[in-house]
């Protein structure tokens, strides 16, 4: 049985959730499947050999039972097989690139690094004959990249989604509790750990923009420039706008939208009627609605914010 040596880069909310999944669900992870995911190629076992972080002492104190795993040192090429990159900054792009250049496969959840690389990381993986996967970077638990990639923009005419579970939680709370202000709802989401260290990434619509950019790339093979995507965050919504929406039996959602027929891309708060498939997607859930040339409208939904 083949044994794969894993290195985790980053140990924030997502990193901790991945570590827990790898350790508690070990018996359910059987092996490696082929590219079409319909055949088990190899039975494997794995070891987490190190967790690379910036502040070793912080994590060793908080997670003393695995203190030996934390390090600031990059592992030598001979000591690992797969890099799992889970940092939340653009610096993750350098980690991905170095691992690929060292002949390692990479799994990443870093939408910022992937989007800002504008396809360079995918090209680097191809150049070195390595695998780069990042399904977890977009739409939480929804396997949307696997669905969009083989279809392309020729068959997908319109894509609309709630791609940021944090802002969806905030908006849901505003419509649940009439006493809650926009500012209070943002503070509540931050306390629950739903928001990025810089909340502007979420409430300003940047996080959803990066994710939409990745989806557009999967459909078209090209990353749109940030200036090509209209962006308006939920931080522009007022308490009065929320009250007016409630009185009209409508709701606001931060919707990421790609219209492949017109080439218009945007991330904006949209006022939705109850007939909209995204209307009832509440809490920290994500959802994506695809309008397909032959299949019509298809909506997928799953957990979003947090680990």
Task: State where each predicted segment sits.
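Glycine-rich adenosine-cofactor-binding loop
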Residues: 5-22, 307
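Beta-loop-alpha module in the N-terminal Rossmann-like domain of NAD(P)-dependent dehydrogenases
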Residues: 72-102, 112-118
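A short hydrophobic/small-residue beta-strand
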Residues: 106-107
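ATP-dependent carboxylate/acyl-activation modules
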Residues: 276-307
